[in-house]
Design a protein with these regions (language model features):
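Membrane-embedded alpha-helical bundles of multi-pass transporters/translocases
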Residues: 2-394
Length: 394
């Protein structure tokens, strides 16, 4: 049943399955693109088109810092958008089309060298991040507007995370190397894979946009947000501050674990091939963690689900350390460690998305205005900042 009140929530109760699954399907394509950039862009720049590794490392750090704070601006722009299509759909369409084009450009060799190659790499990488943000912030900001029913919100929060994990963690991280080799390897493999991913991205987001509810919020003349108002939102919404702190601490821990994994298997276990067993099992486990999230919250509570999410990764890490020193070539135990770590991550992703959706409702109660864009931009800001500083530290 659709909501006819002034609230931004579209459905009072159950969300139609068509809307729910088509919305989630959009995350598959967008995280295929994100996974390709996150996993392979550095090695593509340094090993395929021969950009100096020292330059790429510094450029990536600066670009991620800029991209993180750019999220706040995009969140503000989304919240200020007034159009006949609402405040989310226009940016989903614009961001998807531009980002797909820039993504293909990233994996296209224009046979440059020296300074011109460094400039090219910098421009396309920064542009990719900015155009991805145009689409990503409004995508996640839709969730709190779909329903206020707690059980339905948990389901609609988890589904896109599942598709995102399938795209980024399972397909790209798990099988990306094999796919690139199968498509010709070297530059040809990267370029062909990029074309396939870009086409998939446009298709999945088209399915998402076409099936979104026609009723959209923010077509009126409410006062527009200014940049300084972002800090007012953070200051007056105490639940937002706590949610951001929890997400920050969790991301620091989990990104540090995953960031050192390659070096751990290479230098502690002396077996870099074990990384594959760890990553594939971990990728599957993340999806499983997301799948069981609604059941866990129903049987226990969201609080206990989050405590499980915080407890499982350290347990998996301790097991991994023991395996590394006692039996470094033991594939089953390495896989089990990966499963324990990323099952917790799956639960955390579900918790974080639901927390932020609830924070939007709380903010409307406290401030009298819904700030979906700003609230969800803080999550992506945290993820990008922790990724940048973790990579620099490692």
């Amino acid at each position: 049943m659709e909501n006819n009140s002034n609230s931004g929530v579209i459905y009072q109760g159950k969300i139609p399955n068509r809307v729910k699954y088509c919305f989630a399907f959009g995350a598959l394509g967008k995280d295929l693109i994100y996974g390709m950039i996150a996993t392979f862009s550095m090695i593509y720049f340094t090993d395929i088109i021969k950009v100096a590794p020292a330059f790429i490392g510094s450029m990536f750090f600066v670009a991620k810092l800029w991209d993180a704070f750019n999220d706040l601006f995009m969140g503000m722009i989304v919240d200020n958008t007034r159009s006949r299509w609402g405040k989310f759909v226009p940016w989903l369409v614009i961001g998807t089309l531009i980002n797909a084009f820039v993504f293909i450009t990233v994996f296209t060799d224009f046979h440059l060298s020296g300074v011109s190659l460094c400039v090219f790499a910098s421009v396309v990488y920064v542009l990719w991040g900015m155009t991805y943000t145009i689409m990503d912030i409004p995508y996640w900001s839709i969730i709190p507007n779909l329903t206020s029913d707690p059980e339905e919100r948990e389901k609609v929060s988890v589904l896109p995370r599942i598709f995102a994990s399938i795209g980024q963690s399972l397909i790209i991280a798990g099988f990306g190397v094999q796919i690139i080799k199968g498509l010709g390897g070297n530059y040809t493999g990267y370029h062909r894979f990029a074309l396939i991913i870009a086409a998939t991205f446009i298709f999945t987001m088209a399915v998402c946009v076409i099936n979104l509810p026609k009723k959209q919020q923010a077509t009126g003349t409410a006062e527009k947000m200014k940049f300084r108002d972002i800090f007012t939102v953070i200051k007056k919404n105490d639940q937002l501050r706590w949610a951001v702190l929890l997400i920050l601490l969790y991301n620091i821990g989990i990104q540090a674990i995953m960031g050192v994994a390659t070096y751990y298997f290479s230098y502690v276990c002396n077996n870099a091939g074990m990384l594959s067993a760890f990553m594939i099992s971990a990728s599957v486990a993340e999806v499983v963690g997301l799948l069981i999230f609604p059941k866990v919250t129903k049987l226990l509570s969201r609080k206990k689900a989050f405590l499980m999410a915080c407890t499982l990764p350290p347990i998996g890490l301790i097991l991994l350390l023991i395996v590394g020193f006692v039996c470094p070539s033991n594939i089953p135990l390495t896989a089990i460690a990966g499963i324990i770590v990323k099952t917790g991550t799956g639960l955390e992703l579900g918790c974080a998305t639901v927390f932020l959706a609830d924070v939007v409702d709380y903010g409307e109660y406290v401030l009298g205005v819904r700030n979906e864009g700003v609230v969800f931009s803080l999550q992506t800001l945290i993820v990008k900042l922790t990724a940048a500083f973790t990579a620099l530290a490692i």
